[in-house]
Amino acid sequence: PFMFRPRKQVFPDPRSGSVINGSNPTAERPCQQSYGISFYGFARCQRGRPKSNEDYKDIKFSIGCMGKCKRNTKQPRVLEAALEQMCAADCRDDNSSDASGPFDSALLRNIDGRRDYKPDKSVRRNSS
């Protein structure tokens, strides 16, 4: 049976920053640029995606395909077509291909100005 064991530290490597709060954008840049998947694409990729037991055993990060990318940044040769295709396919499977693009530090500041950013809130905002 699958049992979820909460981890005491999500990012054990001090060099790994959280892509959510953008505290260490340089840590994400190799993965983001080579995969061409934006922050919003990754976030949307993870929303509602079930995690299997293998996922938790294999990845010590909590954000799925981003964790695979970050885990392999220490091994540049691993960042090849196979891993790239896997991460990109994960987000495309969740209908996030429209949010793909290189990570930009201005993305979080000007996220509402992005053409491909379609939050569910916009529907309520326009209809109210």
UniProtKB/Swiss-Prot annotation:
Cite the record's Polar residues compositional bias ranges.
18-27
UniProt GO BP: viral translational frameshifting
| Superkingdom of source | Viruses
Q: Which cysteines share a disulfide bond?
A: none
Which residues does the annotated region (Disordered) include? 1-27, 92-128
Report biased composition (Basic and acidic residues) as residue ranges.
Answer: 111-128
Family the entry assigns? Belongs to the encephalomyocarditis virus protein 2B* family.
Name of protein: Protein 2B*
What is the phylogenetic placement of the source species in the record? Viruses, Riboviria, Orthornavirae, Pisuviricota, Pisoniviricetes
